[in-house]
Amino acid sequence: MAGGPRRGGRRRKKVCYFTANGITHIDYKDTELLKRFISERGKILPRRVTGTSAKYQRMLTTAIKRSRHMALLPYVKEEQ
């Protein structure tokens, strides 16, 4: 393809946000942190997108679900 996108470029290795910043506990009340890992539709972003490790992804998922249950985060965001 003459005008197509280039492929084969090196991708940067994703680094876990929590291990890089020394965060050991994810609090469900910290909604500003949790919003970074939720899509604009309100879905939890997967590890391959965010780069978080498996341990912290499990903790993050639990914290987001608790926060939703306590009505700190919405289950689904409104369409605008």
UniProtKB/Swiss-Prot annotation:
State the superkingdom.
Answer: Bacteria
Q: Which organism is it from?
A: Staphylococcus aureus (strain NCTC 8325 / PS 47)
Q: Does the keyword Transcription apply?
A: no
Q: Does the keyword Coiled coil apply?
A: no
Q: What is this protein called?
A: Small ribosomal subunit protein bS18
The protein's job, in short, is: Binds as a heterodimer with protein bS6 to the central domain of the 16S rRNA, where it helps stabilize the platform of the 30S subunit.
GO molecular function term, any single one: small ribosomal subunit rRNA binding
Q: Which family does it belong to?
A: Belongs to the bacterial ribosomal protein bS18 family.
Share what the entry says about its subunit structure, partners included.
Part of the 30S ribosomal subunit. Forms a tight heterodimer with protein bS6.
Question: What gene codes for this chain?
Answer: rpsR
Q: Which UniProt keywords apply?
A: Ribonucleoprotein, Ribosomal protein, RNA-binding, rRNA-binding
Q: Which PROSITE patterns does the record cross-reference, listed alphabetically?
A: RIBOSOMAL_S18
Which Gene Ontology CC terms are recorded? cytosolic small ribosomal subunit
From the UniProt annotation, give the residues forming the signal peptide.
none
Question: What are the GO BP annotations of this UniProt entry?
Answer: translation
Identify one Pfam family in the record: Ribosomal_S18
